[in-house]
């Protein structure tokens, strides 16, 4: 019954997380586009009011004319819309989902005992420390180098090195699936922390100074803009880290941390293409296509590099006369497979517990799920999760032979 409610919690939290993330990413991408597309106003009246750029656009049958002030307007309106709830809601729902999906069952989903044999409490503590330590290191880098000459390039290079190291470390300490998600959560935490600790406080200071008649220090807007730009480059790498959980060939690869780094780098390069594309149309920067091409080349390179070796075609018992199994005329029997399932699978898919509502402890139910068992246990090797029950390659091969011979139940 507990697994039933956990599945519902997982589904609903995932739904909320996707909804809030769409809202946050959508508004973030829009304002990056807006900043890249602004042109100096032609109207002297607008320039006299302090407007530094404007955009004319049409959408949904209406015309829009957003304007951006160089620093701030002389008088603020009574109602001022703020963009921060999207960020906070995304992080809170994501943290809740991470807790339900991984921390709640750390021994199953977070820990791979072949990598680190530690307690659930220790694994949870270290996982949470990844979120905090990365934010602290990233923030120190930004404060130390962000305002220097070529500060953006220096910060970008240093943060990339830190992300590479964190990816390697996470894949050495945690189960691959959890490691990928943890790196994504680590970066996403820094994104939301940028909003909470820098962007919104700086904007509140600016608004307070305006309302109280004090001169506005432009540094607050500059810092907020810098962190906002960082967030836009973090977005696609985080999305890959989250989506990769559904594709075990990424995080089960021997060099999984390199796979993660390459795909996140490709995401950042592709995001750079979109950022520069708007300015290119206005003649402000060079052609953005090289970034997209390099990003695409990184992805293609990863696909070719990760390509599994060709396997010999499976020969049916009736077609091959040289193998012992063929001579016998049949693959492994049900009782042989049942012994493996009893030791490796029934604790999560038996009469007492049915994770994901999958039960395998009767011939009828096993026959029903035979394709899934073969796919998850033999092809992707995703199950047992993190190999918590210690299934051997020989046992996986036995299940594969049984399935390819027709998954017989006698």
Q: Can you describe what each PLM-predicted range is?
A:
Residues 5-6, 65-83, 217-221:
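Cytosolic juxtamembrane amphipathic/interface segments immediately preceding
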Residues 82, 87-107, 165-181, 234-253:
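Alpha-helical transmembrane segments and their membrane-interface junctions
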Residues 28-39, 132-139, 195-210:
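Membrane-water interface of transmembrane alpha-helices
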């Amino acid at each position: 019954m507990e697994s039933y409610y956990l599945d519902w919690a997982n589904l609903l939290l995932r739904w909320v997380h996707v909804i809030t993330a769409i809202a946050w990413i959508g508004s973030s991408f829009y304002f990056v586009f807006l900043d890249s597309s602004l042109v100096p106003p032609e109207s002297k009246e607008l320039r006299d009011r302090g407007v530094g750029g404007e955009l004319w656009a049409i959408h949904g049958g209406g015309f829009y004319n957003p304007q951006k002030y160089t620093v701030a307007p002389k008088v603020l309106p009574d109602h001022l819309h703020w963009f921060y709830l999207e960020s906070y809601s995304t992080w809170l729902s994501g943290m809740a989902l991470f807790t339900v999906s991984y921390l709640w069952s750390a021994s199953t989903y977070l820990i791979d005992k072949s990598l680190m044999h530690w307690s659930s409490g220790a694994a949870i503590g270290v996982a949470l420390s990844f979120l905090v330590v990365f934010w602290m290191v990233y923030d120190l880098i930004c404060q130390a180098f962000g305002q220097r000459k070529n500060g953006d390039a220096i910060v970008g290079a240093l943060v990339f090195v830190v992300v590479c190291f964190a990816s390697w470390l996470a894949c050495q300490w945690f189960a691959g699936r959890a490691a990928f998600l943890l790196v994504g959560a680590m970066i996403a935490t820094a994104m939301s922390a940028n909003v909470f600790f820098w962007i919104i406080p700086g904007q509140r200071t600016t608004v307070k100074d305006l309302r109280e008649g004090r001169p506005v220090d432009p540094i607050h807007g500059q810092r907020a803009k810098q962190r906002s730009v960082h967030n836009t480059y973090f977005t696609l790498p985080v999305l890959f880290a989250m989506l990769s959980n559904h594709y075990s060939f990424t995080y089960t690869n021997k060099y999984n941390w390199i796979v993660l780094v390459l795909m996140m780098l490709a995401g950042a390069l592709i995001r750079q293409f979109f950022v520069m594309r708007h300015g290119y149309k206005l003649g402000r920067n060079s052609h953005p296509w090289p970034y997209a091409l390099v990003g695409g080349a990184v992805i293609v390179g990863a696909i070719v590099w990760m390509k599994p070796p060709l396997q010999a075609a499976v020969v049916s018992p009736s077609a091959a006369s040289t193998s012992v199994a063929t001579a016998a005329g049949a693959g492994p029997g049900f009782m042989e497979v049942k012994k493996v399932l009893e030791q490796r699978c029934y604790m999560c898919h038996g009469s007492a517990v049915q994770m994901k509502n999958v039960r395998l402890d009767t011939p009828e139910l096993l026959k029903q799920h035979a394709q899934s068992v073969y796919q998850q246990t033999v092809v992707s090797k995703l199950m047992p999760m993190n190999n918590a029950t210690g299934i051997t390659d020989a046992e996986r091969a036995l299940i594969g032979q049984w399935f390819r011979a027709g998954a017989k139940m006698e």
